[in-house]
Amino acid sequence: MCDIQYTVSMKTQNQNEQLDNLSQELRRGALPLAVLCMLQENKYGYALIGELTTAGVEMDQGTLYPMLRRLESQGLLQSSWVVDGARPRRYYVISPQGREVLASLSGEWQKLSRVVQSLLEQIEK
């Protein structure tokens, strides 16, 4: 009896790990798109996390800040330091190149979304 429970428990655990890994892969591709969408105007990191969370996109600082630096190094974002208050804040905004990339990515995302939605609807029939 214990062996059966252990086997079922391990299967469930493995399935949960698989689901978590696949969910992370889905999010990894979507997060830069979400960040570019949200940076149409200057925002600092902490405020951006709040707005993303409000929009339904959970992201922690350990994910966001490396992504912001990477997107900036790719020329998709611009940043500036603003000192007004207790401490300086680095503000980010989408660059002209970032707007072009966002327009292309948006089209790709919509196309992919339609295809996946169609495939899911076929399964549900």
Which residues fall in each region the model found?
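Short, intrinsically disordered or compositionally biased N-terminal tails of bacterial proteins
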Residues: 1-21
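Basic, amphipathic "hinge/linker" alpha-helix immediately C-terminal to the N-terminal HTH DNA-binding motif
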Residues: 88-106
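Alpha-helical DNA-recognition elements
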Residues: 70
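N-terminal helix-turn-helix DNA-binding core of bacterial DNA-binding proteins
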Residues: 22-65
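Beta-hairpin "wing" of winged helix-turn-helix
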Residues: 74-87, 93
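Short beta-strand/turn micro-motifs at beta-sheet edges
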Residues: 20-24, 79-81
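Amphipathic alpha-helical dimerization/coiled-coil segments
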Residues: 3, 103-125
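Generic recognition of well-ordered alpha-helical segments
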Residues: 50, 96, 111-114
